[in-house]
């Protein structure tokens, strides 16, 4: 069985946005949920729009959840 990717969303930066990593690779800086989901889609994660962003065990939110940007 394939291991699920580890998604880490860093705390908001002082200038805005949050760095997003998947399995240690930086995908970019997201400025909102739309950016975040697009990064995941480009990384090959399918059906990301159906993830419960608040409680998904795939996502580690640091410095606030999906409503903090």
PLM feature spans:
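Short N-terminal "domain-start" leader segments
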Residues: 1-13
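Mixed-charge, Lys/Arg-enriched low-complexity segments
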Residues: 42-69
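A broad, low-specificity signal marking well-ordered, structured residues that form hydrophobic/aromatic
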Residues: 7, 18, 59
């Amino acid at each position: 069985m394939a291991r699920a990717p580890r998604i880490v969303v860093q705390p908001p930066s002082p200038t805005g946005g949050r760095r997003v990593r998947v399995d240690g690779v930086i995908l970019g800086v997201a400025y909102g949920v739309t950016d975040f989901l697009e990064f995941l889609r480009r990384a090959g994660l399918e059906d990301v729009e159906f993830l419960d962003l608040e409680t998904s065990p795939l996502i580690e939110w640091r410095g606030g959840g999906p409503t903090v940007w």
